[in-house]
Amino acid sequence: MRPSQRRPDQLRAVMITRNFTCHAEGSVLVEFGATRVLCTASVEDTVPPFLRGRGQGWLTAEYGMLPRATHTRSAREAAKGKQSGRTQEIQRLIGRSLRAVVDLSALGERQIVIDCDVLQADGGTRTAAITGACVAVHDAFRKLVTEGKLPYSPLREFVAAVSVGMFQGVPVLDLDYAEDSGCDTDMNVVMTGAGGFVEVQGTAEGATFSRAELNALLELAESGIRRLVEAQKAAIDRN
């Protein structure tokens, strides 16, 4: 039995609240159970030096956790003077995931900066961040279209992410902290709404996993991501 009492194929309660803050072009609070992440998408009329003069846009991401997002307080990385390897890995993953579904050539010389700030962590912060950031980017593009700055949205399709793992010999979906810290295999899967894989990160923690278990985990992730994309679309349709 899972610590959360959920079925193996059951997601945590998912909530996507749009327009959560008033300044960013796109702003979303995404909740996967007790995990809560604020995702904003900001539009900048500039691009990195390597893209200047090419008529193409860019999308990048930053990720961070509030000091008391976890059970015990962690020092702000700004106070330490450098980002951890984990932070750099996650923000690069978020950027790659969103660039996979954005037509950068349709942006013009603009940059979208995604900021994902973890307010409360209970496992799956990177997957929640990707799922929420996609909706924030959608809203930022909608604003640009409404203002007449773009003829159409450069967002080609949705992208979402979920964790899966082997917990006590059973493939389970959307691990919370208790499951993540006690599982034998931990995997993060990023997919598009059309079913294409963007990234698969899998690690054997306590024991190796078989090809059959890998296939079962991927099928479980695919099912979960379909439901997450439905939640993204439902959040957009509400307003």
UniProtKB/Swiss-Prot annotation:
GO biological process: rRNA catabolic process; rRNA processing; tRNA processing
Pfam families linked: RNase_PH (PF01138), RNase_PH_C (PF03725)
Broad class of enzyme this protein falls into: transferase
Reactions that this protein is recorded to catalyse: tRNA(n+1) + phosphate = tRNA(n) + a ribonucleoside 5'-diphosphate
InterPro entries xrefs: ExoRNase_PH_dom1, ExoRNase_PH_dom2, ExoRNase_PH_dom2_sf, PNPase/RNase_PH_dom_sf, Ribosomal_Su5_D2-typ_SF, RNase_PH, RNase_PH_bac-type, RNase_PH_CS
Superkingdom of source: Bacteria
Residues engaged in binding phosphate: R86, G124, T125, R126
Keywords assigned by UniProt, alphabetized: Nucleotidyltransferase, RNA-binding, rRNA processing, Transferase, tRNA processing, tRNA-binding
MF GO annotations: 3'-5'-RNA exonuclease activity; tRNA binding; tRNA nucleotidyltransferase activity
Enzyme Commission numbers on file: 2.7.7.56
Functional description taken from the UniProt entry: Phosphorolytic 3'-5' exoribonuclease that plays an important role in tRNA 3'-end maturation. Removes nucleotide residues following the 3'-CCA terminus of tRNAs; can also add nucleotides to the ends of RNA molecules by using nucleoside diphosphates as substrates, but this may not be physiologically important. Probably plays a role in initiation of 16S rRNA degradation (leading to ribosome degradation) during starvation.
Similarity remark: Belongs to the RNase PH family.
Assembly description: Homohexameric ring arranged as a trimer of dimers.
PANTHER family, alphabetized: EXOSOME COMPLEX COMPONENT, EXOSOME COMPLEX COMPONENT RRP41
Protein name per the record: Ribonuclease PH
Origin species: Aromatoleum aromaticum (strain DSM 19018 / LMG 30748 / EbN1)
